[in-house]
From Swiss-Prot:
SUPFAM superfamilies: P-loop containing nucleoside triphosphate hydrolases. It is found in: Cytoplasm. The lineage of its organism: Bacteria, Pseudomonadati, Pseudomonadota, Gammaproteobacteria, Vibrionales. It comes from the Bacteria. One of its GO terms (molecular function) is ATP hydrolysis activity. ATP binds at residues 18, 60-65, 257, 322, 394. The keyword Protein transport does not apply. ATPase subunit of a proteasome-like degradation complex; this subunit has chaperone activity. The binding of ATP and its subsequent hydrolysis by HslU are essential for unfolding of protein substrates subsequently hydrolyzed by HslV. HslU recognizes the N-terminal part of its protein substrates and unfolds these before they are guided to HslV for hydrolysis. The keyword Nucleotide-binding applies. Gene3D superfamilies: 1.10.8.60, DNA helicase RuvA subunit, C-terminal domain (1.10.8.10), P-loop containing nucleotide triphosphate hydrolases (3.40.50.300). One of its GO terms (cellular component) is HslUV protease complex. This is ATP-dependent protease ATPase subunit HslU. It comes from Aliivibrio salmonicida (strain LFI1238).
């Protein structure tokens, strides 16, 4: 798991997300507390439960982006789900328990990758030996057995050197690789994914053990395939499973987006089964329960739950009281200003302007955004948000695409040309649309 300090986490988030300091600090502290808890004595560690977070803010201000970036920083099992995808137990649709099953699958895959990475050097050496055995078959005695000899002879060492330098990469050889198991693809109705997995596992077991298949491959491809095969042999599946379940129980993070969509609004008279029932099903997961997965039983007592919602049609108090109590940390994200839009266009790593400059540079078209041009784009997006529906920073994508449409279309024929995107250019391309509210409502 990540050992970054809260300050380092916030600094990393700052390079991708503009503003929202309170939300960044909250998730940074929550992530660091995961590490702090693991430093405690086992008796005290069992008593320390994570403080779950509820992020509240209008659409397009960075709630989902914080989750995306956090997933990369966490170095722990992480899953992001939409609350609207789930229905109450007993109705057709996905049950909330599938969140934990999917998170466990993520942990298994992650732990397997880490284990294979640790034995990567040994696996690559063994893969090299197998390829050298094909290129330089060992001498055999009259009985067909390999003769005892110096495997690291001068010729073998010479070939190993060439292999490592890539001089043999394009040579084709016949190599025995593990044949993929013949699986049975089963299309299951929603909510029956677990049963489908069990059936598929049963059919795979019936198909027998692992078989090999002779294939003609380039040496560089054979090295990769054989290294994966040897790496899989060097790891213990049972130990992996135990480690993955430990990781998911102690370091797992669940991000539930759009939680406001399963609130029953104060004025709502609907008895929608996918709302309050889903909240009640989420309760046991958030407060701690045991979920059955194909890898074993998984406890959710020490998982961190981060939830978010716009809460435009409902209020946080519309959540059922029990769930409100399980989300003690409330963070309100602020609506973005025109100045924030300006910073979003220039400051983050791989900002929108950088992306367009790089994309059109592939066609040998040089794009330059001036300070007044960027200010005008930001003001235009902010103005459209104010006069129509406020969709936050996502409006910048729409405005930029409209602005760059003509040059993107003609770029192939304009190799070597330059374009300066200044105030005048932005006004000529977007002026009429922004001034005319009816047009901007449908086009921007």
């Amino acid at each position: 798991m990540s050992e970054m300090t809260p300050r380092e986490i916030v600094h990393e988030l700052d390079s991708h997300i503009i503003g929202q300091d309170k939300a960044k600090r909250s998730v940074a502290i929550a992530l660091r507390n995961r590490w702090r808890r693991m430093q405690l004595q086992p008796e005290l560690r069992a008593e320390v439960t994570p403080k779950n977070i509820l992020m509240i803010g209008p659409t397009g201000v960075g709630k989902t982006e914080i989750a995306r970036r956090l997933a990369k920083l966490a170095n722990a099992p992480f899953i992001k789900v939409e609350a609207t995808k789930f229905t109450e137990v007993g109705y057709v649709g996905k049950e909330v328990d599938s969140i934990i099953r999917d998170l466990t699958d993520v942990a298994i895959k992650m732990t397997h990758q880490q284990a294979v990475e640790k034995v990567k050097f040994r696996a690559e050496e063994q893969a090299e030996d197998r390829i050298l055995d094909i290129l330089l078959p060992p001498a055999r005695d009259a009985w067909g057995k390999n003769e005892e000899g110096d495997n690291d002879s001068g010729t073998r060492q010479s070939f190993r050197k060439k292999l490592r330098e890539g001089k043999l990469d394009d040579k084709e050889i016949d190599v025995d690789v593990a044949a993929p198991q013949v699986g049975v693809e089963i299309m299951a109705p929603p909510g029956m994914e677990e049963m489908t997995n069990q059936l598929q596992g049963m059919f795979q077991n019936l198909s027998g053990g692992e078989t090999t298949k002779k294939r003609k491959m380039k040496i560089k491809d054979a090295l990769k395939a054989l290294a994966e095969e040897e790496g899989a042999k060097l790891v213990n599946p049972e130990e992996l499973k135990e480690q993955a379940i430990f990781n998911v129980e102690n370091h797992g993070i669940v991000f539930i987006d759009e939680i406001d969509k399963i609130c029953k609004g104060s004025n709502s008279q609907s008895g929608d089964v996918s709302r309050e029932g889903v909240q009640r099903d989420l309760l046991p997961l958030v407060e701690g329960s045991t979920v059955s997965t194909k890898h074993g039983m998984v406890r959710t007592d020490h998982m961190l739950f981060i939830t978010s919602g716009a809460f435009q049609m409902a209020k946080p108090s519309d959540l059922i009281p029990e769930l409100q109590g399980r989300l003690p940390i409330r963070v309100e994200l602020e609506a973005l200003t025109a100045n924030d839009f300006k910073r979003i266009l220039t400051e983050p790593n791989a900002s929108l302007t950088e992306q367009y400059i790089a994309l059109l540079a592939t066609e040998n078209v040089n794009i330059e955004f001036t300070e007044d041009g960027i200010s005008r784009i930001a003001e235009s997006a902010f103005r459209v948000n104010e006069t129509t529906e406020n969709i936050g920073a996502r409006r910048l994508h729409t405005v930029m695409e409209r602005l760059m449409e003509e040059i993107s279309y003609d770029a192939s024929e304009k190799g070597g040309d330059s374009l300066t995107v200044d105030d005048a250019y932005v006004t000529s391309r977007l002026g009429e649309l922004i001034e005319n509210e009816d047009l901007s409502r449908f086009i921007l």
